[in-house]
């Protein structure tokens, strides 16, 4: 057998899956319950979640977390789900209940957004048996007290300053598991990994953008057939 040969099984119907950038494989990965995660797709689009080669999905959205949304994503996904349960608006007992619900439905981790109070993080940590991931939006985020409250992994989403922010926290926390947004291209992803990110979140093209590309392909096919 050829060394490093990795057989790939693919059907004709699934060949258009959303593939994450190959450069993400350079990341060390984070092992959760024996499974290694390098690529984490950032979407709540069930169609994309069902058609991607990412290792996991981070399901957070700009609305209050709701059990129906969490349940729908987990049921549809064929990869592990990290579910959003708390943020600036949703906290306290509701977040703790959301954490319990997410775990009961099969989430592999729960995510708390940047503004989440430490008391809420502690409340979630006390009732779940899965990792708590805290989103970090800048190097000015006070993460020490959040780590003490039960956060196991940080998810850095600092826009254009992400690489600098990853480097900042990696220097101060050499062993801390870090997920980070990779940016728009392979170069920024690689820079993020080099700065110390263990895993990368990837934002896929929208459903509309993917459909537009496919429709263009169909139009070209029709044109070619008409001009033979």
Regions found by a protein language model. Give the residues of each.
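Conserved N-terminal beta1-alpha1 strand-loop-helix module at the mouth
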Residues: 1-81, 87-92, 104
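Glycine-rich phosphate-binding active-site loops on the catalytic face of alpha/beta enzymes
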Residues: 85, 105-117, 152-165, 195-217
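C-terminal helical cap(s) of enzyme catalytic domains, especially alpha/beta-barrels
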Residues: 5, 122-127, 169, 190-195, ...
């Amino acid at each position: 057998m050829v060394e490093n040969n990795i057989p790939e099984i693919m059907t004709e119907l699934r060949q258009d899956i959303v593939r994450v950038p190959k450069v993400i494989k350079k990341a060390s990965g984070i092992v959760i319950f024996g499974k290694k995660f390098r690529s984490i797709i950032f979407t709540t689009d069930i169609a994309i979640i069902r058609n991607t080669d990412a290792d996991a999905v981070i399901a957070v959205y700009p609305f209050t977390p709701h059990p129906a949304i969490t349940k729908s994503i987990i049921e549809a996904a064929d990869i592990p789900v990290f579910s959003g349960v708390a943020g600036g608006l949703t906290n306290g007992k509701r977040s703790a209940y959301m954490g319990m619900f997410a775990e009961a439905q099969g989430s592999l981790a729960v995510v708390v957004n940047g503004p989440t109070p430490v008391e809420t993080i502690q409340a979630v940590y006390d009732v779940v048996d899965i990792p708590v991931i805290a989103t970090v939006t800048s190097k000015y985020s006070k993460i020490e007290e959040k780590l003490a409250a039960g956060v196991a992994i940080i998810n850095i989403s600092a826009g254009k300053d992400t690489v600098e922010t990853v480097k900042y926290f990696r220097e101060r926390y050499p062993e801390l598991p870090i997920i980070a947004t990779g940016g728009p291209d392979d170069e920024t992803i690689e820079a993020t990994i080099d700065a110390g990110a263990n895993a990368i979140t990837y934002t896929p093209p929208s459903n509309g953008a993917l459909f537009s590309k496919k429709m263009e392909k169909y139009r070209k096919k029709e044109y070619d057939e008409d001009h033979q």
